[in-house]
Amino acid sequence: MAPSLKKIIILSDIHLTSDGKKIADLDPLNKLEAAINHLLEKHKDLDHLVFTGDLANNGLESEYAHLKKVTSGLSNPITFMMGNHDNRDSFRKEFPYYAFDENGFIQSSINFGDYILLFLDSLKDPYSNVEKNKGFLCKKRLDWLENQLSLVE
């Protein structure tokens, strides 16, 4: 039997800013709202939406508040991932219900039956200069990955 197909859409590097600040003369919030409207209109059969980092441009709570507002009306499952511009603590304040692993990392797995998606948190602690923060996988995160892979048949 052929594997069942799933429609998964990934939005990456949305770089939300505070108060309509622009990046390269573009407003990331307007662009995200347009993308969400497009998804709602053209991809009603969406099974899962994934946002890979950078969710925010400066890791500010206000930037995650925009993300929360824009995504709050979506009925599809959503997975968020951190990037080097993100701040886990600021994200947590706006999304306190979001799943964190036992070590406080924002990583998860989704089992679609025929395949599994693994989402790793590579944000380097502590949050610092974003230009120098290229990501990191510590032993705890690698152990989590190894455990997830061991669960796969």
Regions found by a protein language model. Give the residues of each.
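N-terminal active-site segment of His-dependent metallophosphoesterases
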Residues: 1-65
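Extended active-site neighborhood of metal-dependent phosphoesterases/phosphodiesterases
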Residues: 61-152
